[in-house]
Amino acid sequence: MKIVEEKILGYLDSKRDEIIDFLRKLVRIPSVVGEELEAQKFMYRTFRDMDLEVDTWEPDVNELRKHPAFFETTSFRKYGYKNRPNVIGKLRGGGGGSSIFLCGHIDVVSPEPISDWTYPPWSGGIVNGKMYGRGAADQKGGICINDLCVKEHSRFRI
């Protein structure tokens, strides 16, 4: 293993509890399609606490429809975008290098029927080293890693 990889993996291991805590908090916020507002408020507070520039907005449906690639999904037809804001946290660089854009989605598929779950879908419980809960892997886990990358980018000169 390369020295850089060893440093990063060692660092991640040292942050394990913090990473798990953040992901568990996010998993415990139900964010079924159409009901993402509370989870987006959580992300807003998270970005603000990281001293990022934060921007939120609800997409303009009429403007979206003008785009040639617009596709009206079933969830869009059912829920639209009211109370489903996009939340962006921006960290401006100080140099002339390239930018990076980390993104993810906070909505999850309904856990129904709840009776089919071995572990509660909003628990974020850990069993045998694995976290269980709606969104733990898709995509709240990815959001958690994005959060860590932004927090720690300068440590690894990324």
Residues covered by each model-derived region:
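Acidic/His- and Gly-rich active-site-bordering loop/insert found
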Residues: K2-M131, R155-I158
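Acidic/histidine-rich catalytic neighborhood of metal-dependent amide-processing enzymes
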Residues: M131, G135-I158
